[in-house]
């Protein structure tokens, strides 16, 4: 109970031991406003609900569901008969389903028992008299003896052959009905059964079949009920209103709560009406649903007044009042779920019905008397049986009598009678108008055009003549004769033509199927092709550009996928459009394929042949050059340390190699000393060019793979370099001593790259080693020498030297220093050489151990001093006989180098017009100016390449100067003038540079690990971006009451999630629409201003600029927080 003395629904349900839904249903029935289980109601209302639930049990079981306004509610109730207390509780359909001997009549397999549709209220009514419930028209014996007579043998009914062409009428049971001449009408039975002597009900199986209307039908014998006088076979006649709630067995039952009102008249022909059961042309199949509302009379069968249900009582109102005289109590012995044979089954479509006043329920009753001589009439929905004997009543058709079952099976329950209602004789209560002509017109439209049109009078469900025991026969005397032109006979013909429509559809489907077959085959072929295509591990891009189609072919995907990917990135591309390198990398990265530039692979190819023809006569064997490659942290330098017995890896910054290291090792092989030259390449992804240069000059590539990590991206790149240089590969599986090492897994992954181990049947040497413990190092060296012996490595030491610049840097004491690998000839001190556009004269040479050398033969790696400037790493050098010839070559190369360098600088500053305009709209073009100084040329290349990969959509990186060497005072002056940041990598500051930087407030950063350098540059770029505001959700509340205070309004809310804070941002959501967004100006709880309200508490919310609160509104609270922006990738 709340503090205000109210009770919540869930508390009440807990007290009563019921579900919340049951209590809510009871509250809804009592018109108590309760939205959910947490709604509050007063103690008085709670008491009403307790009383209702204690008296009637669960609302679901005690009361029908509350109807929508203007709809009647039907409830199915078990009827218990005082006259038949021993009636079984289960449905008696199996017992009642036994047909009388009727050989030719088709029977329905399952005939449900009649359905009593009524409101469960006590009725002040006279005792009802039971009559025989037969769905077949029984005119021969309106009154039956209490004992079941033996049925006479019926004449077999021939199967109808002529189909009907009429559409079903909404208020009639069949399109055509035989007319009933007055001369053929029998008089009512002199004595009717009383409520204590019920007549046994014949099996519904015999009356359920609905054959199609035959043009002629033989006259069957009419069975005579024992105890009733034999009478001539009368014509079928209407003994009650056409009842929308009754249909033949097998008809769909209207669900409880369905509106029994008049359905709107369909605009199209009957054959095209949606949501209406379509009857085949002429006949009703056994088991096929009949339109609810059709009369249950069968073709060719006389109708008995004692065997048909009628609406003879006034509709029962929900308030329990019973104005009419008809009413059947709940105690008539029918099982609760057993439907009556004439009731429509659930799921069926209701037919055309008349509107029912809100709160009314229909009641089915039987008449207790029949009019003596009603005028001829026609029951809608009964097929015409014969055309013989129609002389009476002006040529109207007469239905011959048929054999009717007179006895029920022994197990069939006795049906109690019904009480006669007042107004017997078919007198209509004065003051009630006839039903509208639309129903009559619809009934007339459904008639077959071949049949003679009859006078049709449609009696609605709610007509006051429901109180009449005859069900409105008296109203027929005022029936309106409709014009024949209103029948529109052409519409029913469409029901005969359902066949052409499927034919046309089939034809259309065949055409579509052919196209779909072609599409399906194309899709299957494409899917098979895609299944066969394996996505490559890496793609090589030639000339830094590809078209969309070429990229799709390389990635083994559809070009449309690439176009879609580019579209989501804001790039509109076609199949033939050329993509630049950054776009190609972005697309390939999305599909998980790394990209290798073709120029990098070209750098790994041996483009210059070091041995000329004149050298062939002087060739001798040279030591092999071995390049150690692999992924970062896989143990390359540690392996070289183990070979050289040195400790290089321990002294490297960050524990990673960032330069090419050249070492010479002398080992014993076959009792003779052998020399090996090792090049240690960096494994970081930024040093791709360095690895390519190392592979270009190598003779054997040693691929180091960690046994606990397997094949990684740089491993794949190293394999690509080795294949481009066409050098043999020796795999060293390192770290076999670590826990989790799996050499076999490494071999399996390498086999997927077409590197198959020798012990697996391949030709690739794979040696498991441990660099830290020194395991299998000798075996690895032996395998390297065996591989190089096969290669037959030779050179001419008696000529001028030729080779490659492995690395270059600027030493503040020594000047420009280059690491040279002599590949042919002998390099001596004092030689003049040209390394690309750089001229140099060798002043000194130093080996890897720091010792001075006078000369260096083939496969020797040395550091040379004496260059005019720092040469470019990767350039070939050649010694010339004199300085003049060397200067001529260098001059030509310098002009070319200058042009390419200018192009690179322009490319680094290039900004597209689209990007400039977009940034100009934001108010400022954001740029980060850098001056890059590094220790060696290779490091400058690596850093520039990594900077190119940073996203530049929002911030441009401009490298004003990049060179190896120290940071000088000139660099500081340039940075101060341009607002640049000086980035140094493994270098120092010259004298005066530090003082100049402090004086000009220039930011100078020095790094020794490339990871940290790139990370700080990216953070600096993000620092130029404006911070963004992000919504942070606080909570939600539901408006449950609105209070008006002056001109403003306050919403009484219940906080469902999170919490609400004063002065936070709120959105008011009504359904799916946001009706207000602004600030929460007032937040109160129990008339006290509070800062916040947590979940589960009620509060009052006020907004100065919003007062249109409504119950059920959702208030979302949030706040805006600033967040550092990231670079868009």
UniProtKB/Swiss-Prot annotation:
CDD domains, per database record: IF2_eIF5B, IF2_mtIF2_II, mtIF2_IVc
Chain intervals with Low complexity compositional bias: 33-42, 56-99, 135-147, 162-175, 257-273
Chain intervals for the UniProt region annotation (G5): 770-772
Pfam family for this entry, one: IF-2
Annotated region described as Disordered, given as residue ranges: 33-462, 485-515
Main localisation: cytoplasm
G1: region residues: 630-637
GO CC annotations on file: cytosol
Family from the record: Belongs to the TRAFAC class translation factor GTPase superfamily. Classic translation factor GTPase family. IF-2 subfamily.
Compositionally biased residues, Basic residues: 490-499, 506-515
Annotated region described as G2, given as residue ranges: 655-659
InterPro entries linked: EF-G-like_DII, IF2_II, IF2_N, P-loop_NTPase, Small_GTP-bd, T_Tr_GTP-bd_dom, TF_IF2_bacterial-like, TIF_IF2
Binding site for GTP: 630-637, 680-684, 734-737
Biased composition (Basic and acidic residues): 431-445
Compartment(s): Cytoplasm
Keywords annotated in UniProt: Cytoplasm, GTP-binding, Initiation factor, Nucleotide-binding, Protein biosynthesis
Name of the protein this chain belongs to: Translation initiation factor IF-2
PANTHER family: TR-TYPE G DOMAIN-CONTAINING PROTEIN, TRANSLATION INITIATION FACTOR IF-2-RELATED
């Amino acid at each position: 109970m709340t503090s205000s003395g109210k009770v919540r629904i869930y508390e009440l349900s807990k007290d009563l031991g019921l579900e919340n839904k049951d209590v809510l249903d009871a509250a809804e029935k009592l018109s108590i406003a309760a939205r959910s289980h947490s709604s509050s109601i007063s103690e008085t209302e709670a008491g009403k609900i307790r009383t209702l639930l204690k008296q009637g049990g669960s609302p679901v079981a005690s009361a029908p569901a509350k109807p929508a306004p203007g709809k009647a509610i039907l409830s199915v109730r078990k009827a218990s008969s005082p006259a038949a207390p021993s009636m079984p509780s289960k449905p008696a359909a199996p017992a009642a389903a036994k047909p009388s001997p009727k050989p030719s009549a088709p029977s329905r397999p399952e005939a449900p028992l009649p359905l009593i549709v009524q409101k469960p209220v006590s009725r002040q009514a006279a005792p009802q008299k039971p009559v025989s419930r037969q769905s077949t028209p029984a005119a021969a014996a309106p009154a039956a003896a209490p004992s079941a007579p033996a049925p006479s043998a019926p004449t077999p009914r021939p199967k109808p052959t002529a189909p009907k062409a009429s559409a079903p009428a909404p208020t009639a049971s069949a399109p055509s009905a035989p007319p009933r001449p007055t001369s053929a009408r029998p008089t009512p039975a002199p004595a009717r059964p009383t409520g204590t002597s019920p007549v046994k009900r014949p099996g519904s199986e015999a009356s359920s079949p609905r054959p199609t209307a035959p043009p002629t039908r033989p006259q069957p014998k009419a069975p005579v009920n024992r105890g009733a006088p034999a009478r001539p076979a009368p014509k079928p006649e209407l003994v009650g209103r056409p009842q929308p709630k009754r249909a033949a067995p097998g008809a769909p039952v209207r669900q409880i709560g369905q509106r029994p009102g008049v359905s709107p008249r369909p605009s199209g022909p009957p054959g095209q009406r949606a949501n209406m059961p379509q009857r085949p042309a002429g006949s009703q199949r056994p088991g096929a649903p009949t339109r609810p509302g059709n009369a249950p009379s069968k073709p060719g069968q006389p109708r008995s007044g004692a065997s048909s249900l009628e609406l003879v009582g006034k509709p029962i109102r929900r308030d329990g009042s019973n104005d009419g005289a008809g009413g059947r109590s709940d105690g008539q012995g029918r099982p609760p779920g057993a439907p009556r044979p004439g009731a429509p089954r659930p799921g069926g479509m209701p037919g055309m019905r008349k509107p029912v006043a809100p709160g009314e329920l229909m009641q089915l009753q039987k008449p207790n008397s029949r009019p003596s001589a009603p005028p001829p009439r026609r029951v809608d929905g009964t097929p015409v049986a014969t055309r013989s004997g129609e002389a009476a009543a002006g040529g109207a058709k007469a239905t011959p009598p048929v054999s009717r079952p007179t006895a029920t099976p022994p197990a069939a329950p006795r049906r109690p009678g019904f009480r006669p209602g007042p107004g017997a004789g078919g007198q209509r209560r004065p003051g009630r108008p006839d039903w509208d002509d639309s129903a009559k017109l619809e009934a007339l439209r459904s008639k077959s055009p071949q049949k003679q049109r009859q006078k049709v009078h449609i009696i609605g469900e709610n007509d006051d003549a429901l109180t009449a025991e005859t069900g409105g026969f008296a109203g027929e005397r005022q029936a309106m004769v409709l014009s024949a032109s209103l029948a529109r006979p052409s519409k029913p013909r469409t029901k005969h033509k359902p066949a052409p429509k499927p034919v046309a559809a089939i034809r259309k489907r065949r055409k579509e199927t052919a196209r779909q077959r072609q599409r399906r085959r194309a899709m299957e072929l494409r899917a098979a092709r895609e299944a066969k295509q394996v996505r490559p591990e890496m793609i090589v891009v030639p000339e830094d550009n590809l078209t969309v189609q070429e990229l799709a072919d390389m990635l083994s995907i559809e070009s449309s996928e690439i176009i879609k990917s580019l579209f989501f990135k804001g790039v509109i591309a076609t199949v033939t459009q050329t993509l630049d390198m950054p776009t190609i990398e972005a697309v390939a990265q999305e599909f998980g394929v790394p990209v290798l530039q073709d120029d990098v692979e070209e750098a790994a190819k041996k483009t210059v042949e070091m041995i000329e023809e004149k050298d062939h006569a002087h060739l001798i064997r040279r030591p092999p050059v071995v390049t150690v490659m692999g992924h970062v942290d896989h143990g390359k330098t540690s392996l070289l340390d183990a070979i050289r017995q040195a400790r290089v890896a321990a002294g490297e910054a960050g524990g990673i190699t960032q330069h090419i290291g050249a070492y010479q090792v002398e080992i014993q092989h076959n009792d003779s000393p052998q020399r090996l030259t090792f090049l240690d390449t960096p494994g970081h992804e930024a040093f791709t060019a360095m690895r390519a240069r190392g592979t270009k000059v190598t003779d054997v590539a040693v691929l180091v793979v960690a046994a606990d990590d397997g094949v990684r991206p740089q491993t794949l790149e190293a394999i690509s370099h080795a294949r481009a240089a066409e050098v043999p590969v020796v795999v060293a599986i390192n770290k076999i001593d670590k826990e989790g090492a799996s050499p076999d897994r490494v071999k399996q992954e390498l086999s997927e790259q077409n590197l198959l181990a020798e012990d697996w049947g391949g030709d690739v040497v794979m040696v498991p080693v441990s660099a830290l413990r020194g395991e299998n190092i000798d075996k690895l060296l032996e395998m390297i020498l065996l591989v190089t012996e096969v290669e037959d490595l030779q050179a001419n030491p008696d000529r001028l030297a030729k080779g490659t610049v492995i690395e270059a840097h600027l030493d503040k004491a020594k000047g420009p220093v280059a690491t040279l690998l002599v590949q042919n000839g002998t390099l001596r001190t004092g030689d003049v050489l040209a390394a690309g556009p750089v001229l140099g004269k060798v002043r000194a040479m130093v080996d890897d151990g720091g010792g001075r050398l006078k000369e260096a033969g083939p496969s020797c790696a040395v550091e040379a001093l004496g260059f005019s400037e720092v040469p470019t790493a990767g350039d070939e050098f050649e010694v010339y006989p004199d300085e003049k010839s060397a200067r001529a070559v260098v001059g030509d190369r310098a002009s070319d180098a200058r042009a390419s360098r200018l192009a690179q600088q322009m490319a680094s500053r290039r900004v597209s017009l689209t990007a400039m305009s977009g940034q100009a709209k934001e108010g400022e073009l954001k740029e980060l100016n850098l001056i890059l100084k590094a220790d060696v040329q290779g490091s400058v290349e690596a850093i520039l390449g990594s900077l190119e990969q940073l996203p530049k959509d929002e911030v441009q990186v401009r490298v004003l100067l990049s060179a190896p060497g120290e940071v000088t005072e000139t660099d500081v002056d340039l940075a101060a003038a341009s607002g640049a940041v000086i980035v140094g990598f493994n270098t120092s500051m010259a004298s005066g540079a530090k003082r100049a930087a402090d004086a000009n407030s220039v930011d100078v950063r020095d790094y020794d690990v490339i990871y940290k350098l790139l990370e700080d540059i990216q953070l600096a770029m993000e620092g130029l971006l404006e911070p963004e505001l992000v919504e942070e959700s606080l909570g939600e509340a539901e408006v449950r009451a609105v209070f008006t205070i002056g001109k403003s309004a306050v919403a009484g809310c219940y906080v469902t999630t999170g919490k609400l804070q004063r002065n936070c941002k709120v959105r008011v959501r009504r359904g799916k629409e946001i009706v207000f967004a602004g600030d929460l100006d007032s937040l109160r709880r129990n008339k006290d201003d509070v800062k916040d309200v947590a979940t589960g508490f009620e509060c009052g919310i006020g907004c100065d600029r919003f007062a249109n609160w409504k119950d059920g509104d959702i208030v979302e609270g949030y706040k805006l927080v600033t967040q550092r922006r990231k670079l868009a990738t």
